[in-house]
Every structure is written in C-alpha cells, then in structure tokens.
A protein has these predicted regions:
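N-lobe entry segment of adenylate-forming
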Residues: 1-85, 89-104, 108, 132, ...
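Short hydrophobic alpha-helices that are characteristic scaffold elements of the AMP-binding
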Residues: 127-132, 154, 308, 316-320
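Conserved AMP-binding/adenylate-forming
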Residues: 83-84, 98-146, 301-305
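Conserved AMP-binding A3 loop
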Residues: 86-88, 245-247, 254-280
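Adenylate-forming
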Residues: 68, 90, 94-97, 101, ...
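ATP-dependent adenylate-forming carboxylate-activation enzymes
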Residues: 116-117, 134-150, 164-166, 303-304, ...
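Conserved AMP-binding/adenylation subdomain of ANL enzymes
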Residues: 279-299, 307-349, 360-362, 455-457
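Gly/Ser/Thr-rich phosphate-binding loop
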Residues: 230, 346-350, 362-443, 454-457, ...
Length: 469
C-alpha cells in the first residue's frame, strides 16, 4: 500500500514507521537533562555535543539512522553486485524484519545471534534487531566450538540467523547447541534479476575465479541439519503492526561485537556496546561538529567481517551520514582489488596487505593497466600503522592512478586506524588515529605524512562520572 506525502509516494510501512518514531520522540521532550557539567575534563565544544546527544538523541541507533534519512528515501542506501536498494526500500525491509522478529517472540533485551556476511539481508537484520530493542550477537564462523556453543546457549535464543555460505563450517556447533531453528540467508537472494525474474551475478566471471558460491543451499541444509531450517523468506512476515519501534535509551545495550581473537585463538573477546557508543561515533562525524567535508551521499565499501566493531561502526556511520554501502560478502586480501574496481567506492577500510596487493596489481598487472580510481577519495588502513616504505608506495600508486581526483585536486594520503596491541578493530579504549597532515618531513630522519592524534582520554570514573583512582 502506498501513501502520497507531498510529491512523494511512500510505502505505508514507511509512513507507519515514522509515525511510531515521532510518537516516541515527542514523549521524550519533557525529560531532557545534562549529565556532563563540571565532571569531565573535556572541551566546551565536546561537552556541548555530548549534552546535545543526551538531550536530542536519546534513542536507539536504528531510530537515529531512520530519522536522519527522512529526506533521503529516494537515495541509494545499498549496492550489492549490481543491485541498488534505496533508503525507502531498506527501511521497508527493516520494518518487515522487525515485525517478524517480534511476532516470533523476540522482546527488548533479548539477544539475536547471527553468523552474517555483508549482504542486504544482514543490514536489514542489524537495524531491525536494534529497532525492537534486542541485542545483536554478531558471531564469526571460525570461533572455537565450545565457545560458540556457550555464546549460543547463553543468548537464550531459539533462533539463529546464518549466511548459508558459512553453514557447513558451523553445522556441528549448531547441532550441539540449544538452538531450535536455523534461519538461512542466501548470498544470491539480492542479486539482480534477469527478464525471467531469476537472480544472476553480473560479476560471475570474476567470482568464479575465487570459487565464490551464491547458489541456494537451503534444500541440502534442511536434509542435513538436526534443527528446523527456514529460509529467510519463510521466516519473514509481511504484515503491519502498531508496536514495532522500541522506546530505548542511549544506555540500553545494542550489540555485541568481537575482537580478532589473536590473544586466545578461537576465543575472541566480546564487547558489549550501548546505543550511545554508535550514536556518539556517528554524531561526531557530522559536518557541523567535525568541520570535515560532508559524507552525505558518498559510497563506502563494506567487506570486513560483520562480527567486528570496525565493520558495524562503518555500517552505522555510513548510513547515519546518508551514504551508500557497497556490500562485499567475501573478505579476502586477494579479492579486495576486484571489490574496489567493481564498486568504485569513495572510501574503504582495509588491511595494509590488501592495499599493497591493490597497488601492486594496479602498477604491474596488465588486467588493471587502464584502471583509474578518480572516485576513491579516502583510504583507511586497519591494523598497525604503515611503515614509511608502504606509505610511500601507496602514495605513489594513488598519484599514478589519480585516486580521488574527481573530488580533490590531488590524492589524499592513507589514514591509519590501529589499537595498541590489537589488530583491525577500534573497539578498545586504547585507540589512536593517524591522520595525514600533508606536511613535508625528512625521509631520512623521521617517518613522514602520519602524525598521531589522541582519540580518547583514558580515565577511571566513579558512578557519578567523577575522576577517581
């Protein structure tokens, strides 16, 4: 059902979604309060932003993203192997997923376990879980068997959502857990459709080189699993409800991500995030706060595993800023170059090894001889800081292949995000951002181009927010 609003014809689900959100926002108008005055050693501007978040953004991350894009409904939100999904269509999906979760028995505070990939189905599930007040438990297929079973059993959930591309790896873990129903998400469900209505992959020639499998595995899995197995299409309920959006606060738990697991192989540390964590990260990237160029309408490659905070934050930040997510379900250093060329994103996080492989192929592989990346404005290197030699080589390649020159007069040097003692995540408190200042340094006596910037003040606070030992 469609409803005409101004010059737009909007799906009834979207109208109902914003009606429920507006009702919750109006109910919060009388309970604004500041918590920060005189308690933290922070700048006046930072304090003002934190007060604004408390006063005007005291809700779930999903509500924040949906509110922020109220005027962007016709804009592309997701790109997936040639399929384009608008913000309106994405929010319709979120509505359907949220309603289906609630009708299945999920309530505020419950955990929704997921073994996902970067697909439209995962994005919809991510936002829907948060919208109804549940906690996303985003798991990796490589986690230790006993650890996986512990997390699944502790979640209390009867359901687990699984990308069928990883099912075979976790089958025994699921079979031996207390989970009752496995809901499968197929990598091929959101591929473009041909004239006969069948899904097809316009990049099949490239994917086939890497044995990437988009086929529907549900019938085989249904015969092999000890659990009830549903396809995501069988799980979804397309009805409507007056009670989908949960009235959450900033400090309500929202999602659980995991570190790389290098300390104890197979047993990565879990990190519980409140709505405040992701909304604060996103709000501080707004142009009026950061002073940086707006991300509005830019495209971001999402290819890092979705159990990491870095990827969940990349997704939430980009959607909050009205960006287009370029979804890549395969995290592979050797495939990264093809993801960049296929999607031509404006921004992408990636490991040093991924970027060096991209640069080597751009410079030496005849297949990439004529490739220019004029839309590729920002490179973010995850993990430890770049060596001077690596940075020099990446900068050389960026100049040669004209990275980002549609938006900037010359290529921008890579930005590096790392943790002391960690790899590829920014979920810890010991986070340092490295920002290229484009200043001239002596190549002989000191590193060049990267200057450390403090990202967070580390302090011990009591329950009232005062400093203590």
């Amino acid at each position: 059902m469609k409803e005409e609003t101004g010059n737009l014809v909007i799906d009834q689900k979207i109208v109902d979604l914003y009606r429920q959100i507006d009702t919750i926002i109006n109910s919060k108008e009388e309970i604004k309060k500041s918590r920060y005055e005189g308690k933290l050693n922070i700048s006046a501007k930072t304090q003002k932003v934190l007060e604004d978040i408390d006063d005007n953004h005291n809700y779930s991350l999903a509500m924040g993203i949906i509110r922020k894009n109220r005027k962007n409904l016709n804009r592309n939100a997701l790109s997936y192997r040639g399929t384009k999904i608008s913000y309106e269509k994405l929010f319709e999906m979120v509505y359907t997923y949220a309603n289906s979760l609630k009708n299945t028995g999920f309530k505020k505070g419950m955990q929704v376990p997921v073994f996902g990939e970067n697909t439209p189905e995962f994005i919809a599930l991510y936002l829907a879980t948060n919208l109804i007040g549940c906690e996303l438990l985003s798991l990796g297929e490589w986690f230790d068997k006993d650890y996986t079973e512990f997390l699944l059993n502790k979640s209390g959930s009867k359901y687990v959502f699984v990308s069928d591309s990883v099912y075979d790896v976790i089958k025994d873990k699921l079979d031996d857990s207390k989970i009752e129903t496995v809901v499968l998400m197929n990598l091929g469900s959101s591929l473009p459709k041909d004239k006969s209505g069948k899904n097809y992959n316009p990049y099949a020639e490239i994917d086939d080189r890497f044995n990437h499998d988009f086929s529907d595995k549900s019938e085989r899995i249904k015969t092999e699993s000890k659990k009830e197995v549903l396809k995501i299409e069988e799980f979804l309920d397309d009805s409507m409800s007056d009670d989908i959006v949960c009235n959450m606060s900033l400090d309500d738990p929202a999602m659980i991500s995991f570190t790389s697991g290098t300390t104890s192989p197979g047993v990565p540390k879990a990190v519980l995030h409140a709505n405040r964590s992701y909304l604060t990260l996103s709000r501080f990237k707004d142009k009026d706060i950061s002073g940086l160029a707006s991300m509005d309408g830019k495209s971001v490659l999402c290819h890092i595993p979705v159990y990491t905070h870095m990827e969940l934050a990349t997704i939430s930040d980009a959607l909050y800023q009205g960006c287009e997510l370029c979804l890549e379900p395969f995290y592979d250093r050797k495939f990264f170059k093809y993801s960049i060329v296929m999607y031509k994103p404006n921004y992408s996080p990636g490991s040093e090894g991924s970027y060096l492989d991209l640069c080597k192929n751009l410079n030496d592989n005849p297949e990439f001889k004529n490739v220019t990346l004029k839309d590729f404005v920002a490179m973010c290197i995850t993990g430890e800081g770049l060596t001077p030699g690596s940075e020099k080589y990446i900068n050389y390649t960026a100049r040669k292949h004209k990275f980002g020159t549609h938006a900037a007069p010359r290529p921008i040097s890579p930005i590096t995000a790392s943790i002391g003692g960690g790899t590829s995540e920014n979920s810890g408190v010991f986070t340092t951002l490295f920002k290229s200042l484009r200043e001239k340094f002596s190549f002989r006596n000191e590193p060049f181009g990267l200057i450390a910037l403090p990202f967070a003040e580390v302090a011990v606070l009591d329950d009232e927010g005062h400093y203590c030992k």
